[in-house]
């Protein structure tokens, strides 16, 4: 019952019935999700939609048993109590309730950065060199993996978002501290080649890639603070020009579809500062909808305001 992207359009808020805005949860991204969900809820109500907040998966399960809602707008971020790992999608499928975003497979695959990379590489799509580290990897294995990839590298949890638990490593002395930080959030870790250059992201809405955004943080990189707290990060949209812009939009669509995603989402990309080559990083299947978030910024470039964006995402459940 996930959103199958088609041409269903409506101007009648009653067509949606009662809508649950799924937010909060218990993942490490709870606060971001509460912020996103509050914005979505306000936008739907402003358009006359009968929308109610539902905090987390257990509350949603109770509501579905009681048949309280006709569809779900999912802005539950992350995994382990979040809404991007396929678990809540399976719940909604079991109850036959339409919902926004990717289905079970697309959500679960995209949450696992390592599996996503394997799919992309099998299709010839570029992604940085990487290694997987199991929980409790020895210091010898950690340093060996770093040498194989070549410094500098990124160390991150394999199944987290919002730059939670992510470190940049420029010398071997920083490695074990970075691994310890990432391991707080997930058992499996991803060690990845650090691409020096432009950080870009491309939002996908239905079958359309929106204009890319080039992210220019005031600090060295786009961390949690730059994403959600600081007001000095620059967002350039479109992030590229001409053929380069067309290329990154097509790459994002290819990567999104390869991961089995649909509905809406966001694809993060690095552009090598020397060669100009594009490298896929990850897919976000329930992107942020905060004041700092990137999907609304890209939509505005096409004249789509926030309320209209939220409406169009929900329309895909009809």
From Swiss-Prot:
Subcellular location: Cytoplasm
Residue positions binding Mg(2+) 1: 268, 282
Swiss-Prot/TrEMBL cofactor(s): Mg(2+); Mn(2+)
Binding site for Mg(2+) 2: 282, 284
Signal sequence coordinates: none
Listed GO CC annotations: cytosol
Alphabetical GO biological process terms: cell wall organization; peptidoglycan biosynthetic process; regulation of cell shape
Pfam family, one: Dala_Dala_lig_N
Origin superkingdom: Bacteria
This protein's record includes keyword Transcription: no
Boundaries of every ATP-grasp domain copy: 117-315
Keyword list, A-Z: ATP-binding, Cell shape, Cell wall biogenesis/degradation, Cytoplasm, Ligase, Magnesium, Manganese, Metal-binding, Nucleotide-binding, Peptidoglycan synthesis
One example GO MF annotation: D-alanine-D-alanine ligase activity
Binding-site residues for ATP, renumbered to this chain: 146-201
Reactions catalysed according to its record: 2 D-alanine + ATP = D-alanyl-D-alanine + ADP + phosphate + H(+)
Record's function text: Cell wall formation.
Protein family according to the UniProt entry: Belongs to the D-alanine--D-alanine ligase family.
Annotated protein name in UniProt: D-alanine--D-alanine ligase
Gene: ddl
